[in-house]
From Swiss-Prot:
Gene3D superfamilies the record matches: P-loop containing nucleotide triphosphate hydrolases
Protein's recorded name: Cytidylate kinase
GO biological process: nucleobase-containing small molecule interconversion; pyrimidine nucleotide metabolic process
Coiled coil: none
Enzyme class: transferase
Organism (species): Streptococcus mutans serotype c (strain ATCC 700610 / UA159)
UniProt-annotated location(s): Cytoplasm
Gene name in the database record: cmk
Residues annotated as binding ATP: G10, P11, A12, S13, S14, G15, K16, S17, T18
Major location (coarse): cytoplasm
Amino acid sequence: MMGIRIAIDGPASSGKSTVAKIIAKKLGYVYLDTGAMYRSATYLALQNDTDLTDERAIVKLLKDYPISFGRRKDDSEQLVFVGNVEVSHPIRENEVTNNVSTVAALPLVRKTLVDLQQQLAKKGGIVMDGRDIGTVVLPDAELKIFLIASVEERAERRYRENLEKGIQTDFNTLKKEIAERDYKDSHRKISPLKPAADAITFDTTGIDIAGVVNFIEKKAQNIIDRS
């Protein structure tokens, strides 16, 4: 039987990527980080001194340097490539983070990447996370989850992540950047950040990863058992 499609959406640092990876591994599904795709497009534009509002130029870069995914030999980490270059860590740098909302709002860039995402999800058995998976990319996904958390908590998570990576950041600056990104993502004209009408909204403030995973896994298993 073909596996179900699970859409996990939410704002920056809501825990969606961490949770989606674990859910995919538990179910034996494919995990697709759509945010990494928009980050890769932003990275390409920055590296090639391309105007971040020039959607045709960025789409051409995406065709010249196709985005692909792989895994480390020990299966510990998903790797992201543009062309033949591995960019898993560079696409997480602050310069990319602070500009990705601009690139992600470009209609042609969104169409190019959404088409690819939908193609990858056709066979089912996939967990996809992003900001418009349940509303645009997989509107007919069998399970849609929308994760939220307070700005304070999300800034704390990002702060800890950066420290672990050796990146020095100011906590208050992170809070400001996250709040600004929330505004940009939820107010853009194309695919704004919002829960699908049939999505389950889950507030992860004060809840650890295991608790969130357990909640989603139970929902998924109920659907799988009924299929």
